[in-house]
């Protein structure tokens, strides 16, 4: 039976789904087209749900993945992938190849070919005859991490349609999370849990764990990390799924074996099959911090199990209990490990001799501890961005402190000249218009004869320039007429040079004009500045106009 004749796929472009190749379209359009088709099929799943005894049953769609390096085949689908690739290269034989492959997929994945008593045959038939997606299917991913995740899931049992949708959703949004399982030593007398070095006993780490909460609802209310001791649950209400692919081992670590370790946290472990909602309910009653599922759904009931799980688990549980999903292959391995760690004696478990040698002959039990991290694989990028932003902040703070120190030095210079900082800020505000000194005001400013600097005695009392008084003597006005002159006593500061031209007062240029703030300049330097530029003193930035007006008011 051709895959395109299936009632579930009659509305899809079979070339896009089956071969992953349409010769006349570019890669981006092919990828979007395939994703949209699968989403449409998933949204209409309830419409096409059929009883198991119908003559036409939903055909499982399985996906294998080929690495970005052309010619590298992943998982157990190498044989089928190579045949699909040959059909991809030979356009003339594409139609006949697709028909023969689709017939093999339909016959091998038929629910009747599965046997409840033979799990291994079910696994082999579920992973064979998978539909190949070529290396141009995920060209947007430069990292091999999502590619490896798809390969691991497809080759280990998560290759049915319902499960593939979850994996593809995780690939599209990069929502794979790290899972770590280590050996813990629980001391019976103090009930203390201590971690072991991973080279001493059992250790497992995978970055390909999927959280079902992210697919069905939201992870916004969940914590970042979930830690606890793993134990196997029994489904609530004695639920039994006869089509489940789980393997019953002789022994395991049950809730009764870890019930006294609740303070360390508990992680439930269960197969994901039709009874998965009952396992969730039991985990809630056990007050577990999270539940770790491994896929145990067959091709015939995979879609039903995932629909049933979404309908049976309430929203509050989705938002409060983390539910992780790992592959069938890893789940069966953990089943066996739990069996080996079910012994109550430390030296009776796996690598017991090494544990006794490491810890000594102590009264303790070996258990498996689980750590599920919510942080995605981009955590390293987030850390790099955080460090970069922190470095930029430190550099910005250093620059601010540097300029702040420079401004403080400038303010100290103003204070040394007796100028209040607040007055200076108000006078040079950015919105304050510049005033100029008129010719009449300029003529009122005296021009004096510089009589030479006087050095101060270290024992003299310090007096600021604004406090000194003029001793009347010879001086000149703006027209060169002799008026009065003044000499500053040895106890007062003095200016030895004009701060505009930076030339010292000497016998060649002894004249200076004195502003009301007692700063002096050469008349040839200060007069054009006051008449054309501003009435602010070049040194203290005080307004000459305001100072003259205040002086006239004081005289009145």
From Swiss-Prot:
GO MF term (any one): ubiquitin protein ligase activity
Name the predominant localization: membrane
Q: List the disulfide bonds.
A: none
The listed locations are: Vacuole membrane; Cell membrane
| CDD domains per record | RING-H2_PA-TM-RING
Among the entry's GO cellular component annotations, what is one? cell division site
What name appears for this protein in its UniProt entry?
A: Uncharacterized RING finger membrane protein C15C4.06c
Q: Which InterPro entries match?
A: RING_finger_E3_ligase (IPR051834), Znf_RING (IPR001841), Znf_RING/FYVE/PHD (IPR013083)
Q: Where are the transmembrane segments?
A: 379-399
Q: Where are the zinc fingers (RING-type)?
A: 498-541
User: Which PANTHER family would you find in this protein's record?
Assistant: RING ZINC FINGER-CONTAINING PROTEIN, SI:CH211-59O9.10
Question: Topology in the membrane?
Answer: Single-pass membrane protein; Single-pass type I membrane protein
In its UniProt entry, the species of origin is given as Schizosaccharomyces pombe (strain 972 / ATCC 24843)
Q: Which UniProt keywords apply?
A: Cell membrane, Ligase, Membrane, Metal-binding, Transmembrane, Transmembrane helix, Vacuole, Zinc, Zinc-finger
SUPFAM superfamilies attached to this UniProt entry: RING/U-box (SSF57850)
Tell me which Gene Ontology terms the entry assigns under biological process. Answer: ubiquitin-dependent protein catabolic process
